[in-house]
């Protein structure tokens, strides 16, 4: 390994001076650069540093896209950017390159604190941005960090003070701002919001406002998304006054309010099919069966639907790998699923909108939307998972007759016109019988189907666009049957929150919510329990099952016909209460101790009760004694005694004949087994004889057996060592294989090996 070159003080001063001169020259090029005149095509045509350019070349990023060509020069000059471009157009590099260049020109070090903050609405998108930054920043000396939910907070807090570029989700970033001691944002140079319209909506409003309040107003702000917002209120929250709008073919022009162009890629083939709600799963299964050599993403509206469709389709085995991804999974499972899906060639991923924004999946062939999205922006982000970077892609959305007219009108307002597909009858396949069979056999799967039904109905109920989502026209009974359920579960819509309220509660900080329960001193006040202290027996009787026998499961499985109107506020509940002594029976107690002892004695009680009688029960449940004597009248009705005797003998003979056949088979099997064992013993004896004859051959060593001294012995002493280790027979002496007879009359012979040896030994004994 080559030694690191060391410089003296003079050389270091010269290097620093060269770097300062190079940065000044670079800033001069940036000020004089005009993209409209130069029209750059490659990254090397831009006024960026050599270290950033080297990282781009090593990562095979050579050619500029439209959004990069228009936004990077403006970002380098220090303008605030409101960037919008079609999905898959390279927006990530459009803000990562200015971040690296800004910190490089400022000569940023780890002692300067946090220099750039990049906020992403989802964990998966934040991880993707972090991976791209690691690729293009290999030649720089900046430190980068990723903070997302599902990771160890203490581990992040210990290292966040040395981070120059921080990437994360809004909730975790705000948590570190409140708790991490070493996080200093006073010197922040750049703030980047990826998928800015999602970060600025109601779900992250309070969190983002709290983050922005901790940042200096002199920062540079970059906003990027495929569906950008120009709301003056949102821009004022981020202190955007003098900003540049870049790459805006899909943004509403603030002057005339007209759409300037479609926001989906030209290489994307968009289509839709008109299908009834109860037939959606049949259509989805038929589509998957006819596209087994494809890589597709199937979007559904809720995590419970994703889980139900994945579990049922997995049991039916359509012939393609199936995966599922939703926000209720653990972070480790989500990361592993994304990694497997990216590496797979032919696979189907059932997912919610957690992966609808920004995630760059390689080589997606189809994007299928089973449920209608809440708005056109969600539709654009979903279909944007395919046809990225100029590649081909296809998308299909399933619209019910109630949704078709209204949603197509919304798409036409954004110049999106999908073509209508007609499915061949030969390609359609009904899976309702299979679903009913699966749910009948598996109660937990049935419970999952009921929750999927409820989640879909509620998702339609809370939508704001009532022209598209017509709740009153939903065929609930038919939809429940299509899921394999015997009937539609009971749903309570009272007090259902809106979409904005649900998003706000989902993204709210748990620690901020806990502050509402604190007193003036900041101590957490626990509510006093009004119930008395419960014993372990009370807890045992109050214990309830948490699976399919839970209270929630029993509530949704009740038949609506059996429920009364009063069930909403009156229900039977087990309680412990005092018993009325007047209703208790008066039992006579023994007066003397001898009587009490006799009453408790089992032997004494049996003497008065008599012997136990054994009974048997027939098919009708009636009890009979084991042995019943036939009466005289019944015996006469059965016929003559000789006839009954012959009938009984014939019956027993038939039974014996049947048993005799079985006994013969058992005897035959035992005989064959005995013969097999005898032949096996003969074979083992023959193998042992062959081993003794070939004892002079070289031994095969085995690892881990024997002694080290055995492995190191002299080859010439094999026979002697073998004879020493071998157990001697009763007619062998210390002098092995000695043919001479001793003086005491004992015949000493070799060990008999064959039948001839035994015959010769017998003859010698007779002669003696």
From Swiss-Prot:
Highest taxon listed in the record's lineage: Eukaryota
A single GO CC term for this protein reads:
nucleolus
Molecular-function GO term, any one: ATP hydrolysis activity
Q: Where is the composition biased (Basic residues)?
A: 667-678
Which reactions fall under this protein's catalytic activity? Answer: ATP + H2O = ADP + phosphate + H(+)
The residues that the entry says bind ATP are 85-92
Q: Where is this motif: Q motif?
A: 41-69
**Region Disordered: which residues?**
581-612, 653-754
Provide the Helicase ATP-binding domain boundaries. 72-246
Q: Which UniProt keywords apply?
A: ATP-binding, Helicase, Hydrolase, Nucleotide-binding, Nucleus, Ribosome biogenesis, RNA-binding, rRNA processing
In what ranges is there compositional bias, type Basic and acidic residues?
653-666
Q: Its principal location?
A: nucleus
Q: What is known of its domains?
A: The Q motif is unique to and characteristic of the DEAD box family of RNA helicases and controls ATP binding and hydrolysis.
Q: How does it assemble?
A: Interacts with the U3 and U14 snoRNAs. Associates with pre-ribosomal complexes.
UniProt name for this protein: ATP-dependent RNA helicase DBP4
Q: Which organism is it from?
A: Vanderwaltozyma polyspora (strain ATCC 22028 / DSM 70294 / BCRC 21397 / CBS 2163 / NBRC 10782 / NRRL Y-8283 / UCD 57-17) (Kluyveromyces polysporus)
Q: From which lineage does this chain's organism come?
A: Eukaryota, Fungi, Dikarya, Ascomycota, Saccharomycotina
Q: Which gene encodes it?
A: DBP4
């Amino acid at each position: 390994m080559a030694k690191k070159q060391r410089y003296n003080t003079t050389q270091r001063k010269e290097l620093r001076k060269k770097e300062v001169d190079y940065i000044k020259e670079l800033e001069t090029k940036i000020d004089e650069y005009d993209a409209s005149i130069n029209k750059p095509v490659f990254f090397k045509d831009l006024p960026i540093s050599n270290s950033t350019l080297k990282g781009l070349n090593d990562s095979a990023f050579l050619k500029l896209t439209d959004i990069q060509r228009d936004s990077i020069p403006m970002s380098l000059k220090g303008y605030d950017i409101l960037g919008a471009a079609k999905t898959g157009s390279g927006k990530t590099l459009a803000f990562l390159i200015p971040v690296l260049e800004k910190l490089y020109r400022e000569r940023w070090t780890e002692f300067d604190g946090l220099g750039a903050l990049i906020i992403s609405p989802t964990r998966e998108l934040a991880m993707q941005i972090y991976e791209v930054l690691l690729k293009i920043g290999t030649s720089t000396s900046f430190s980068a960090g990723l903070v997302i939910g599902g990771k160890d907070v203490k581990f992040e807090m210990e290292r966040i003070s040395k981070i120059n570029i921080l990437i994360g989700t809004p909730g975790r970033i705000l948590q570190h701002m409140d708790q991490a001691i070493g996080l200093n944002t006073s010197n922040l140079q750049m703030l980047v919001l990826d998928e800015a319209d999602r970060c600025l909506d109601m779900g992250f409003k309070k969190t983002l406002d709290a983050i922005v309040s901790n940042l200096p107003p002199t920062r540079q702000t970059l906003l990027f998304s495929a569906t950008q917002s120009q709301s003056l209120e949102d821009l004022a929250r981020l202190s955007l006054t003098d900003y540049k709008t870049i790459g805006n073919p899909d943004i509403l022009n603030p002057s005339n309010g007209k759409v300037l162009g479609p926001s989906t890629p030209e290489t994307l083939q968009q289509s839709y099919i008109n299908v009834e709600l109860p037939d959606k799963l049949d259509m989805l299964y038929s589509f998957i069966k006819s596209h087994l050599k494809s890589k597709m993403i199937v979007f559904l509206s809720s995590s419970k639907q994703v889980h139900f469709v994945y579990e049922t389709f997995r049991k039916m085995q359509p012939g393609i790998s199936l995966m599922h991804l939703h926000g209720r999974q653990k972070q480790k499972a989500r990361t592993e699923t994304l990694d497997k899906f990216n590496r797979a060639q032919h696979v189907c991923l059932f997912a919610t909108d957690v992966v609808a924004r920004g995630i760059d999946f390689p080589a997606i062939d189809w994007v299928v939307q089973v449920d209608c999205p809440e708005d056109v922006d969600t539709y654009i982000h979903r279909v944007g998972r395919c046809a990225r970077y100029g590649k081909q892609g296809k998308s299909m959305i399933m619209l019910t007759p109630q949704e078709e007219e209204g949603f197509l009108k919304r798409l036409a307002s954004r110049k999106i016109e999908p073509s209508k597909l007609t499915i061949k009858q030969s390609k359609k396949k009904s899976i309702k019988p299979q679903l009913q069979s699966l749910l009948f056999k598996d109660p937990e799967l049935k419970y999952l189907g009921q929750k999927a039904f409820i989640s879909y109905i509620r998702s339609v109920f809370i939508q704001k666009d009532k022209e598209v989502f017509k709740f009153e026209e939903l065929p609930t009974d038919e939809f429940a049957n299509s899921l394999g359920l015997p009937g539609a579960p009971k749903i309570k819509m009272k007090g259902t929150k809106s979409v904005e309220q649900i998003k706000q509660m989902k993204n709210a900080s748990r620690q901020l919510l806990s502050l509402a329960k604190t007193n003036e001193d900041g101590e957490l006040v626990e509510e006093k329990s009004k119930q008395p202290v419960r014993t372990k027996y009370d807890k045992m009787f109050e214990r309830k099952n948490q699976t399919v026998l839970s209270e929630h499961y029993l509530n949704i499985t009740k038949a609506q016909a059996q429920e009364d109107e009063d069930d909403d506020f009156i229900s039977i509940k087990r309680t412990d209460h005092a018993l009325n002594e007047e209703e208790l029976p008066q039992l006579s107690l023994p007066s003397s101790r001898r009587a009490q002892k006799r009453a408790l004695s089992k032997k004494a009680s049996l003497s008065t009760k008599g012997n136990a009688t054994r009974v048997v029960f027939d098919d009708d449940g009636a009890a009979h004694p084991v042995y019943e004597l036939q009466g005289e009248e019944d015996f006469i009705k059965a016929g003559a005694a000789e006839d009954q005797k012959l009938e009984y003998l014939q019956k027993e003979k038939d039974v014996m004949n049947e048993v005799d056949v079985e006994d013969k088979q058992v005897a035959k099997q035992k005989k064959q087994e005995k013969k097999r064992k005898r032949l096996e013993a003969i074979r083992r004896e023959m193998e042992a004889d062959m081993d003794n004859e070939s004892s002079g051959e070289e031994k095969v060593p085995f690892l881990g057996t024997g002694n080290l001294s055995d492995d190191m012995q002299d080859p010439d002493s094999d026979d002697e060592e073998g004879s020493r280790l071998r157990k001697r027979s009763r007619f062998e002496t210390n002098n092995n294989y000695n043919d001479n007879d001793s003086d005491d009359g004992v015949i000493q012979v070799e060990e008999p090996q064959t039948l001839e040896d035994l015959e010769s030994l017998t003859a010698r004994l007779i002669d003696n």
